[in-house]
Curated annotation (Swiss-Prot):
Record family assignment: Belongs to the universal ribosomal protein uL15 family.
Gene designation per UniProt: rplO
Job description of the protein: Binds to the 23S rRNA.
Keyword RNA-binding recorded: yes
Skewed-composition ranges (Gly residues): 24-34
Pfam families attached to this UniProt entry: Ribosomal_L27A (PF00828)
Protein's organism: Bordetella avium (strain 197N)
UniProt protein name: Large ribosomal subunit protein uL15
Taxonomic lineage from the root: Bacteria, Pseudomonadati, Pseudomonadota, Betaproteobacteria, Burkholderiales
Length: 146
């Protein structure tokens, strides 16, 4: 391999395309109308409408009804899998421990354990609810919910 110098670096063959020069005469293939066709709104400078504009017809986003809402308390709750509890190296688990381990976000106030994955070690859940299946799995592993 030859010495590579900063002043000898060049892009690979075919990697760069020549800039499209429009409105520079008939011979260029992009003269006169410069690829814009003849007349009409789109041929003129500043001649573009906003996205969703339908020529004065009521646009689709206004014809369709509004639906649903965003619950404000959505980010307060988090679901935790049994496999997440298995990975934690503490026996007593509460929301603070889940936050510290990065299992749930910092804005979470309430957590619920769902039956997803395996749990083979004893854990004590404090201030955390669980589904019926998850509760059975925790108790089968020798743990409890406080």
């Amino acid at each position: 391999m030859s010495d590579i110098q900063l002043n000898s670096l060049k892009p690979a063959e075919g990697a760069k395309h020549a800039k499209r020069r429009v409105g520079r005469g008939i011979g260029s293939g992009l003269g006169k109308t410069a690829g814009r066709g003849h007349k009409g709104q789109k041929s003129r400078s500043g001649g573009f409408h906003k996205v969703g504009f339908e020529g004065g017809q009521m646009p689709l986003q206004r014809r369709l009804p509004k639906r649903g809402f965003t619950p404000l308390g959505q980010h307060l709750y988090a679901e935790v899998r049994l496999s997440d509890l298995q990975r934690l190296d503490v026996e007593e688990i509460d929301v603070q421990a889940l936050k510290a381990a990065g299992v749930v976000g910092q804005g979470v106030r309430y957590a619920k354990v769902i039956k997803s994955g395996e749990l083979s070690r004893k854990v004590v859940l404090r201030g955390i609810t669980a589904t019926a299946g998850a509760r059975a799995a925790v108790e089968a592993a020798g743990g409890s919910l406080a």
